[in-house]
Amino acid sequence: MLELVFVIVVIGILAAAIIPRFDRDTLYEASEQLLSHIKYTQHLAMVDNVYDDTNQNWFQNRWGISMSEDDYNYSIAGSGQVAVDPTTGDAINGTGDYNLNDKYNVKIDVAGATGTYNLVFDHLGRPYNGVGTTAVNSLLQNDLVITLTAKNGENVSITVQPETGYTSLGDFVSP
């Protein structure tokens, strides 16, 4: 019995010494979160039944994710409503968990854009791009590259492909 207590104490000491050494990879967490929310936005666009025979512009009701390079946050909205995070039930509105700089100390950079960038998906899942409201008529023609950079200079890119909207995570690059 004494041996069992001794073994438990030793395991407890080792666990207390080892567990604090596991560092969080905040860049990985932020990139996975943004990647999954881009895919979620595309999913919402494809399953949302926005057809309205009384509105000739029904096809312009789209879901989009707006990314701010100034505040390093993002929000998802479409069809007159803000998306709800299925894991937490919170609105994905650019605050709290959706501010990557506050939560993960990570910055967003969208290639070729300044300020707020809108990535919009139509009912077929095709991506449109633009700043402000120009996303309605500008089908994505080239790969869209979103770079996330951690405080230590490490970065990773998320790529959205034209026509299909296929979204992928690139390799992590150290400074």
PLM features per residue range, with description:
Residues 22, 26-31, 167-175:
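Polybasic/polar functional segments that serve as interface/processing modules
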Residues 26-57:
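Membrane-proximal N-terminal amphipathic helix
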Residues 44, 48-51, 59, 114-136:
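Charged, amphipathic alpha-helical segments
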Residues 56-124:
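Type IV pilin-like appendage domain
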Residues 126-128, 152-175:
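Low-complexity, S/T/G/P-rich flexible repeat/linker segments used as non-globular hinges
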Residues 138-150:
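Short conserved beta-strand and strand-loop elements enriched in small hydrophobics
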